[in-house]
Swiss-Prot record:
It comes from Homo sapiens (Human). The keyword Protease does not apply. GO terms for biological process: mitochondrial translation. InterPro entries: Ribosomal_Su5_D2-typ_SF (IPR020568), Ribosomal_uS9 (IPR000754), Ribosomal_uS9_bac/plastid (IPR023035), Ribosomal_uS9_CS (IPR020574), Ribsml_uS5_D2-typ_fold_subgr (IPR014721). Keywords: Acetylation, Mitochondrion, Ribonucleoprotein, Ribosomal protein, Transit peptide. One of its GO terms (molecular function) is structural constituent of ribosome. Residues 374-396 are annotated as: Disordered. Coiled coil: none annotated. PROSITE patterns: RIBOSOMAL_S9. The keyword DNA-binding does not apply. This is Small ribosomal subunit protein uS9m. The gene is MRPS9.
Amino acid sequence: MAAPCVSYGGAVSYRLLLWGRGSLARKQGLWKTAAPELQTNVRSQILRLRHTAFVIPKKNVPTSKRETYTEDFIKKQIEEFNIGKRHLANMMGEDPETFTQEDIDRAIAYLFPSGLFEKRARPVMKHPEQIFPRQRAIQWGEDGRPFHYLFYTGKQSYYSLMHDVYGMLLNLEKHQSHLQAKSLLPEKTVTRDVIGSRWLIKEELEEMLVEKLSDLDYMQFIRLLEKLLTSQCGAAEEEFVQRFRRSVTLESKKQLIEPVQYDEQGMAFSKSEGKRKTAKAEAIVYKHGSGRIKVNGIDYQLYFPITQDREQLMFPFHFVDRLGKHDVTCTVSGGGRSAQAGAIRLAMAKALCSFVTEDEVEWMRQAGLLTTDPRVRERKKPGQEGARRKFTWKKR
């Protein structure tokens, strides 16, 4: 029984082998005929993918192109703002002609109350010129060429301005060398008073030029203007420099000066108050005296044993060169010795303003004698040893 089984299995395996060879040959023939067509199709698909992969739009990717606003768009927004302003004035029962931006802000805060802490997230109604940023006009012609020769620097207005300032400096140096050759150069240099004005800050300069500047660009521009201002420039150059300065209101004009009072004997005095931390002081400075200072009825040298605290009290008189010319009576309460000395110094400096000139008041303000110290003791934090100090860390 074993031999027929072997022969039958061999016949079956032989038939399977012949069928497999035939099917493989047929497949190879079909592959040879279809291979060129498949290769061309695959190549075309690869090329198609290669050329179309870059034009597939990406989702949820913000565009880096800056949004532009046309003049017609801005005009339309201004018209809508004026119409909304009239409606808002009528709703609030106000006159639309005298309805200012402060009234608009007050009305918006009343009609749309918001508890958001971030003020920029609250509803606003501003003029379109404040909402939409300023933009440049078209900088190139119909042929695609830019109008300005510094267009490809990326900051044409900035570099054009730097070129103008440097050209002025070269002209001034040339003029000075010409005068020096003829011995006509003046010996005295003219000093220009720049008190009461400041340079444009970086954001203001960017708004003027409608360009983004780095900190280095801003510093180089200010340094060049300062060099031009310190040189012997004329009226035209000085007027050019003033375009980049803004006037500042002097604090001395806002400083409240205590009026001079008179006691029963007819002696003039001035009274003022001061505070530092939790200490509060009141000082009476007499117009004439020998330099005696009493604190709570005690001489200041006995009340303040530390030399540093005594120097704090004497500094306002030393600053305006009036040591030994005024008598002072002070009362102070609260705080420690250092805080009490600071409160008394502030009170005496404010009272002393009644007997000095306006220029000396401004000098005292710039020295910080008329400014209240806002610093207070920082609170202890939970989980810490102090306000800033942490507990000692131990591994075990």
